[in-house]
Amino acid sequence: MAKKILVIDDSALMRRVISDIINESDEYEVVAIAKDGLEGLDMIVSHPYEYSAIILDINMPKLNGLELLKRLQKDHIEQTVIVVSTVAKEGAKETIQALEYGAFDFVTKPENYLETKSIDFKNKIFNMLNVATNSRSSLRRVSMRTGSASSVRSTGTFRKPEDSSKPFFAS
């Protein structure tokens, strides 16, 4: 069964391009699309365990990607979010903030339509989906075996639990 992906982007072209790329694979399927952060947040809240990963734009109307990430973090909603950023430089402030707010990783959005068709862009999307969804599955298996589900989060970064001096997968 294909892993379910939610795409949140205000650009109809990017929604279509990303959906087409993902749907080329038998492993993933775009099952929902949102045209802004508010619509995306509603989808996530109403179906919190529906999506294996979310591909999110930063610059959007109503609720931008950073605000959406902050809301997910504040409300303790566990999701694997990959940011597809319009920011040209990888070290840009918005991208760093997205990672701080819980994004799994990011891909720089192509500057023109021809670049969206490049093998490099497709590979970046698939590589991130593979790493993100496999990390999430591995962490869930660990939490099931150890009974520490509340300490395990989907991003796979390390954090020390308050009641232990040993590192544990969390974010």
Regions found by a protein language model. Give the residues of each.
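Strand-loop microenvironment adjacent to phosphate/nucleotide-handling motifs in alpha/beta enzyme folds
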Residues: 1-171
